[in-house]
Amino acid sequence: WAQVVSQENLPNTMTMLPFTPNSESPSTSEALSTYSSIATVPVTEDPKESISPWGQTTAPASSIPLGTPELSSFFFTSAGASGNTPVPELTTSQEVSTEASLVLFPKSSGVASDPPVTITNPATSSAVASTSLETFKGTSAPPVTVTSSTMTSGPFVATTVSSETSGPPVTMATGSLGPSKETHGLSATIATSSGESSSVAGGTPVFSTKISTTSTPNPITTVPPRPGSSGMLLVSMLIALTVVLVLVALLLLWRQRQKRRTGALTLSRGGKRNGTVDAWAGPARVPDEEATTASGSGGNKSSGAPETDGSGQRPTLTTFFSRRKSRQGSVALEELKPGTGPNLKGEEEPLVGSEDEAVETPTSDGPQAKDGAAPQSL
């Protein structure tokens, strides 16, 4: 509510108008510019209207200049106003007289304010209403006292203006959550502000308490590795190593077996020299003339010479070194004996030293056979 005082026609009439505290109002500079005529015109109080609550004594008229900006935020009320009841603020109106009206332009602020504090001075029979207190976050400033000097033929007026006081100091309490063995959590910070009262003389104490809490996130848990996992890893590595060793052993055995097979082949090819290979010559062929002479000269079968039929069968050789080959050689030498003469007998006898000749010697003529058989016995 706002109070409008008009002294133009009805001196004792008060008009109450609704007023919103949070609504925006013109600033002090705008008020001074709009009501420049009001600040220069002195206000004259009627002695009949200045009534004291302690008596019906009249006070002399006094003129107070309104040119001071510090006093533009206060207004005077009649002495009949109670000291405990807050005095409503004044606002602008078209019905207010330009000669005897006082207008209060409150400071707009978004911060919630307390009810105004009224201080009553019984000596001067006047009440001074200050603006409401506002709470801020910061360091508090000491109150400022503005005292106006006594005017000529006027009472002493004392005005106390309290500056805006800040809120109570904030106490921070920080608690940290210690990490456990397996759970790694983050620290939680809880900030709590303690409330302290700040008041002005004659006003209502102000209490403010704010509690801010920061939420802690969910703890992060890390799962440690199980002791059995390392053992399983070691076992798997051992198994893999064993399999590799077995494969290597099998490969070596197969290689040795292959070497053995190739060794038998190399032994069979050991007679190979300078690109030529020794091979079996096959059956030996005897000329037809030699075969016929051998069969004719050997009259008995004991000589071991093969008998030839009418078809002319040829003897065959099965091996390089055999008794049959030596027999054939001896037969060939015997064929050469009658044609060569006695000079070759001594040379041929040591060459043909076999038991077959000893058997054949009795069939030969005279003492020559005996002489030839004698050195063989020796």
From Swiss-Prot:
Topology, Extracellular side: 8-231
Any one annotated GO CC term: extracellular space
InterPro entries (alphabetical): Leukosialin
Tissue specificity note: Cell surface of thymocytes, T-lymphocytes, neutrophils, plasma cells and myelomas.
Start-end of Polar residues biased regions: 310-321
Transmembrane segments: 232-254
Protein name, entry field: Leukosialin
Organism: Rattus norvegicus
Name of encoding gene: Spn
